[in-house]
Swiss-Prot record:
Biological role stated in the UniProt entry: One of several proteins that assist in the late maturation steps of the functional core of the 30S ribosomal subunit. Helps release RbfA from mature subunits. May play a role in the assembly of ribosomal proteins into the subunit. Circularly permuted GTPase that catalyzes slow GTP hydrolysis, GTPase activity is stimulated by the 30S ribosomal subunit.
Annotated localization: Cytoplasm
Pfam short name (any one): RsgA_GTPase
Record carries keyword rRNA-binding: yes
Main location: cytoplasm
Family, similarity comment: Belongs to the TRAFAC class YlqF/YawG GTPase family. RsgA subfamily.
CP-type G domain mapped to chain residues: 63-221
Binding site for Zn(2+): 245, 250, 252, 258
Protein's name in the database: Small ribosomal subunit biogenesis GTPase RsgA 2
């Protein structure tokens, strides 16, 4: 019995990467009865029938799982936003951060297209960078030509996703990383049957000793399962101060003696971050129940 990680799922086959090789596997027949649906990123136990084919025997417990894209065991999410074209939006950045924080995935903020920004825009980005770094987030900026080495350092030994709205440079980032992999991944690409005209599915690409989920469509934000009372845990600087609130169930909205509001007034929490917290809180409270 071998252990490996699913790096692609297509037409009922699961492509499992183990010790430098890729095996085309099917799931055991009883998976459906046990309500087990393997995902790309799953760690699995499998047995091989020959040099290239095998059967998945069991799926290990997951650290986390995203719905769209359907991928499991993500260690890190590189959230790509452009400085300009489209302009950097703290509102959008905070919404992506909430979506990633709620899955207990480490976010890294990448701000692209800095070479296209004016001096005043660069100064404003620098202010935002300082604020997010003070919260505890890693932030790096890139020009039109991405800093591949910096990105590889983040990905090393991990499974990562790259997310962001359309037009911010996700494809440029992936393609620049992928260009270095032609020789290294030739064998894997052949095993997976990757071609120019194949339908795009979620797929883990090896980058150094890590993997990146090739998810071109990852630009939506999902928080259907997020409850109003748990939103505060997706804002680290709010979570850090909640213990100082007078009332145990404080939502940091209209309650008296709120340590979070006091921190906002003292400029210890960025006003825009608190504003976005309240906006999202109201959206969650006003959300219609789904049946």
């Amino acid at each position: 019995m071998l252990e490996g990680q699913i790096i692609k799922a297509l037409s009922g086959f699961y492509y499992v990467f183990s010790e430098g090789k890729v095996y085309q596997c099917r799931a055991r027949g009883n998976f459906r009865k046990r309500n087990i649906s393997p995902l790309v990123g799953d760690d699995v136990e499998f047995q091989i029938e020959n040099k290239t084919d095998g059967y998945i025997l069991d799926v290990m417990s997951r650290e986390n799982a995203l719905v769209r894209p359907p991928v499991a065991n993500i260690d890190i999410a590189i959230l790509v936003f452009s400085a300009v074209e489209p302009d950097f939006s703290t509102n959008l950045a905070d919404r992506f951060l909430v979506a990633i924080e709620k899955e207990d995935i480490k976010p890294v903020i990448c701000i692209s297209k800095m070479d296209l920004a004016s001096e005043s825009e660069k100064e404003q980005i620098a202010v935002y960078k300082d604020i997010y770094e003070a919260i505890g987030y890693d932030v790096f900026v890139t020009n039109d030509e991405p800093d591949k080495e910096a990105i590889k350092d983040y990905i090393s030994g991990k499974t990562a996703v790259i997310a962001g709205q359309s037009g911010v440079g996700k494809s440029t980032l992936l393609n620049s990383l992928n260009s270095d992999l032609t020789l290294k991944t030739a064998e894997i690409s052949n095993s997976l049957g990757r071609g120019k005209h194949t339908t795009r599915h979620v797929e883990l690409m090896p980058i150094g000793d890590g993997f990146v989920a090739d998810t071109p469509g990852f630009s939506s934000i999902e928080w259907d399962d997020l409850q109003p009372e748990t939103l505060q845990f997706c804002f680290p600087e709010i979570e850090d101060r909640r213990s100082g609130c007078k009332y145990r169930g404080c939502m940091h909205e209209n309650e008296p003696s709120c340590a979070v509001k006091t921190a906002v007034e003292a400029n210890e929490i960025a006003e825009f971050r608190y504003k976005h917290y309240i906006q999202i809180l109201q959206e969650l409270k006003n959300r219609k129940p789904r049946y």
